[in-house]
């Protein structure tokens, strides 16, 4: 009996892994083509000294490239201040992008959010009600859940997938698999 239980558990874990792998990969599409007027850049950890973490830097580099290619797009820099952060994620993002040459007029700060859900919820305050399409910029592992949340708020989202730093890739991809399922359950009950 124990042997069959272990086999069943192994099969269920394999199915879970394959299913969530599919969801994570599907989150990287559709690729943004500049057809939106607003792009939400999702915040991430800010290190001591108001230095963007590597994951945040990769997101910002992708946002910079997108802003240069599509200068009509307003970037909504979304992220509040965590207990262990010196500044809001949005202010660190704004400084980083302005230092690289992005116009301040192209940047909108959203500095209250503390989760992916509130990143998108609070960023919507900066988007006119007539806009139903938005671009989301984040690390590749994060986009499936971000799109799930955008869909909850009736936004059609295309994406810019920043790479995930190799040093954290395994950890965040495992965590995100459970995050996807948990987020879906939470959204069912909202």
PLM features per residue range, with description:
Residues 170-189:
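A transmembrane-helix-recognition feature enriched in membrane-embedded lipid enzymes
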Residues 21-174:
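A structural signal for short, hydrophobic/glycine-enriched beta-strand patches
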């Amino acid at each position: 009996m124990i042997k069959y239980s272990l086999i069943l558990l192994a099969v269920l874990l394999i199915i879970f892994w394959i299913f969530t792998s599919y969801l994570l990969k599907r989150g990287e599409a559709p690729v943004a083509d500049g057809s939106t007027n607003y792009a939400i850049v999702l915040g991430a950890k800010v290190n001591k000294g108001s230095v963007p973490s590597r994951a945040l830097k990769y997101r910002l580099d992708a946002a910079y490239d997108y802003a240069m290619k599509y200068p009509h797009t307003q970037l909504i820099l979304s992220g509040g201040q965590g207990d262990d952060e010196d500044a809001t994620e949005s202010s660190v993002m704004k400084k980083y992008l302005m230092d690289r040459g992005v116009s301040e007029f192209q940047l909108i700060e959203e500095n209250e959010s503390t989760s992916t859900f509130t990143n998108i919820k609070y960023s919507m305050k900066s988007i006119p009600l007539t806009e139903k399409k938005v671009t989301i910029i984040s690390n590749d592992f994060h986009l499936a859940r971000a799109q799930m949340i955008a869909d909850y708020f009736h936004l059609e989202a295309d994406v810019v997938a920043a790479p995930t730093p190799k040093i954290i890739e395994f950890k965040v991809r495992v965590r995100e698999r459970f995050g996807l399922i948990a987020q879906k359950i939470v959204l069912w009950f909202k």
